[in-house]
Amino acid sequence: MVEAPLIDTRAARLMAWFALVFALATDAAYLLLKGGQTDTAIYVFTVAFVACYLVVLAALLGASLMRRWSAGIRLSLRAGAAAGLLVLGVLAISSIGLPLLIAGAIATGATVRTLRGPFVTPSSLSAVAAAVLAVVVLVVGFEVSERAIVCPAHGSTSGGGTGLVTGPYFYDCINGQLTFHSGSCSSSSIDSNGNVTHPGC
């Protein structure tokens, strides 16, 4: 297998910079957006995960600009950041997805511009592995954080969602007590004893 000559061009570095700035700016906007929503306390772990994940992706792009790393390592760092930004952008398309897709596209451009010559090489395979790892971390992070519901100490509430792997679920919160159920349900009520019921589910 012939290794491709990797060239960290000025254009690739500028694109990595732009993607980094886009990612951090979107992260800041996301935190401001969530800070003004009433359900942020319930989903605090999901909000924290997304915010930290974006910081990590920005850090990967920043690290790819350091000349201490070989061009092959920079390629993998940019590929991982690009994949994470693109997939998160698709998942969050109804809120912060568009700027993330732009950042991901720019990071992808930086990745492609770093690679020259044959595409099936150890460096390109490492870049693919980095991209897959970034997506796996994103999926696992969502699966775990979405179920780490923080129930209010008093009162009752309910909600639900759909895991990327595990499928739909819904939950009940009563005076700080969390109960999970498999499947989907949009109907809930409180009986005379203060228990949550789901008629029709």
What do the predicted segments below correspond to?
Residues 50-70, 110-111:
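Canonical alpha-helical transmembrane segments
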Residues 27-50, 87-101, 141-201:
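Membrane interfacial helix motifs at helix-loop boundaries and amphipathic/re-entrant anchors
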Residues 120-146:
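Internal/C-terminal transmembrane anchor helices
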Residues 5-8, 65-73, 115-124:
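Membrane-interface helix-boundary motifs at transmembrane edges
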Residues 1-26, 32, 59:
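Cytosolic juxtamembrane helix and N-cap/initiation of the first transmembrane helix
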